[in-house]
A protein has these predicted regions:
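Contiguous, well-folded functional domains in the mature portion of proteins
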Residues: 2-157
């Protein structure tokens, strides 16, 4: 079972080469799962950007949750966008208000346009620096195109 399990398209794709559904996204960090409503940022907690959940990380590494392409990689290093090969748009947001750190404590390993495989190291973060800046380090994973799917379910395993 994966982090986001049972992503189901609201309509069956017409193209014969389309990936099979359900689609599973792996956890992008090691740690404890945080339910969407418990994420300490109202935009994410209310699902405004899409269905999401968090991980309270136990190590400073972020991994690709699926095969895909990096679509966003801001200089601040605190977030990444991925379009998976299955058509799932994923936003990985590291910490709350960490954009204020202006890249300090973040070491991206990918750039926009890079192809990634599930499990590839995407970025490293310094959890001590995030804590010293008084920001929650929760890693938030959002399916930004939630409305394209019949259901998005979080299954912790």
């Amino acid at each position: 079972m994966g982090f986001f399990d049972f992503l189901k398209k609201s309509a069956e794709p017409a193209a014969p080469a389309a990936p099979a559904f359900p689609v599973t996204l792996a956890a992008d960090a090691k740690g404890t799962v945080v339910a969407m409503e418990n994420i300490p940022d109202e935009v994410f907690a209310q699902g405004i950007l899409g269905k999401c959940c968090g991980i309270d990380p136990t190590e400073g590494k972020i991994y690709a949750p699926a095969d895909g392409e990096i679509t966003q990689a801001p200089d601040s290093g605190h977030a990444l966008g991925i379009m998976t090969t299955a058509g799932v748009e994923v936003l990985i947001h590291v910490g709350v208000d960490t954009v204020e750190m202006k890249g300090d404590g973040f070491s991206p390993k990918v750039k926009e346009g890079d192809k990634v495989k599930k499990g590839d190291l995407l970025l490293e973060m310094d959890l001590d620096k995030i804590a010293a800046a008084a920001h929650p380090a929760v890693v938030i994973t959002v399916v930004t195109n939630t409305d394209d799917f019949k259901d998005v379910e979080v299954v912790a395993s």
